[in-house]
Amino acid sequence: MKHLEEIVMEALMPASRNATQTAGRVVSGATAALLSGATAALLLLLCALLAAWSRSDKSSVPGPPFYMGIGPLLSYFRFIWTGIGTASNYYNERYGDIVRVWINGEETIILSRSSAVYQVLRKPQYTSRFGSKQGLRCIGMHERGIIFNNNIELWKKVRTYFAKALTGPGLQRTVAICVASTDSHLDQLEELTDLSGQVDILNLLRCTIVDISNQMFLRVPLNEKELLVKIQKYFEAWQTVLIRPDFLFKFEWMYKEHKEAAHELHEAMEILVEKKRKALEEAEKLDDADFATDLIFAQNHGELSAENVQQCILEMIIAAPDTMSISLFFMLMLLKQNPEVEQEILKELDTVIGDKKAENSNLQHLIIMESFINESLRYHPVVDFTMRKSLEDDVIEGYKVFKGTNIILNVGRMHKCEFFSKPNEFSLENFEKTVPNRFFQPFGSGPRSCVGKHISMVMMKAILATLLSRYTMCPRDGRTLNNIRKTNNLSQQLAEKDSELTMMFTPRRRQ
C-alpha cells in the first residue's frame, strides 16, 4: 500500500488542467486567487466533517484507501481538478475495471467492465443520475427537462415528448432538413473563411446543427451565432457546478458567473418560446405540430409548468451543437489521418448517391460510412461516460452496492475491450462483424438510454454525406487528434481556440 505522501503527490500532479481552466472562469481578476484558496479550505472542512460520520467498514471494491477521511478528500479533489472523465480513466487504469472512489464524500463506483456496465444500463433501479442539487438548480436542470431530471415520474412524462419528436415523422424529415441546412451553410462558406483560405470548421458545424435543431423542434427565427455563444457559456457553467458541494452555493460570489450564464440562455429561450407561442396563437390551422408545439399545448392543459417547457426546449436545442459538432470534427480529423478509409467512403458516396442529394432511401445503404461513424464513436468519443445513482441495494459482479451509491459507467474505456479485433487502433475491421450491445454503447441502452440515439446517426450520416460530396477538408499542417489539446470533464472539449483548428476546403471533383 502506498504511503499517504505518495497519494497526496499523485492527487496534486498536473496531469490535466481542467480545473485550472474552469477555476479561471469562476471569477475574474483578483478574485480568482481568493477563490482558489477558499475552495481548498472549504473542501478540506467538508471532508473532515465527512470523515467524522462516515461508516467505519471498508468496501471490498478495489480503490484508494480511506485514510481517516483524507482518501475521500483527495479522490474528490482529483475529480474537480482534472475533470470527471479524466479522473475516471485514471482510477480505472490504476485499480482495474471496477473501482470505488468518493465524490463529495459519497461512495462512487466506476465501472468499465462490459458485463457490469450492461447490468446497470438495463436495470430500472439506475434511472436516476447523481450531481449537486444546488448546482443543478443554478442552471435550471433540477427536476426539469430530461438530461439531469431526477424526479423519475416527471422525467418519464417529459421523455414521451422527446421520444415522439425524435422518432416517427420527425425522424423521417431529418435527412431533408440536414441536407438543406448543410448545403445552405456551405453556400455561405466565405463568411467563415479567413484571408489565408482557412475555414472555421467548428463554427460551421455548430451553426449548421443549431439551424437543424431549430427547424426540427422549434421553428422560429433566431440568430445562430448569438445563441451559440450563450449555449457555450451555459455548457461551461453546467460542467463546472455539476459536482460542486452544495454548501459552496451559500456564497453567491462563487457561482455568480455561472448563474448569470444560465440566466442568459434561459432568457434567450424564453423569448424564443414566446415567439413560438405567439405564432401558434396567430396560426389559422396547425397541420404539422412539432416538439415545442406539443410542449406548449401540454402547458396550456396544465400537464407541464412553464419552467419545465422552457427547460425541455432549451435541452433539445443545446443537446447537439456542443457534442455532435465536436464528434463530426473528430471524424473529419480521423478521415485525414486514415486516407484509405476516406477513399472507401467517397467511393461508396459516388456509388450510392452520385450526383443526387442524400435521401432516406439511399442513406441506409451507406454501410461503410456507418461503420466509420461507429468506429469513430468507439475510438474517440466526445462523451465517454454516464452518471447514475443506485435507487436500491444491488450486487454488481459480486460486489455489494448500497442504495444511494453513485455510479460512473466508463463506456469509453469499455469500448477498448478485447472483443474488438484492434481495440486500441482506429480500424473499420472492428465493425466487420455485428457487435453485441453489451460491448458497444455509444448512446447507452435500457430505460435511460439517449432518447435521440437513432436520429443522431441519421443526422451525422446526412451531414457527412453532404460535406464530403462537395468538399475535401484538410486540417492545418501537422494537426492530428493526438496533438490537439483537449479536456475531459462532462465531455471531451477542445482546449484550443477555434482559429487554431481551421481546415482548408477544396471543392471535390468526382472521379
Curated annotation (Swiss-Prot):
InterPro entries: Cyt_P450, Cyt_P450_CS, Cyt_P450_E_grp-I, Cyt_P450_sf, Cytochrome_P450_Monoox. PROSITE patterns: CYTOCHROME_P450. CDD domains: CYP19A1 (cd20616). GO terms for cellular component: endoplasmic reticulum; membrane. It is found in: Membrane. Expressed in ovary. It is also found in the brain, but not in the spleen, head kidney, kidney or liver. Its cofactor is heme. Its EC number is 1.14.14.14. Coiled coil: none annotated. Belongs to the cytochrome P450 family. PANTHER family: AROMATASE, CYTOCHROME P450 FAMILY 4. This is Aromatase. It comes from Anguilla japonica.
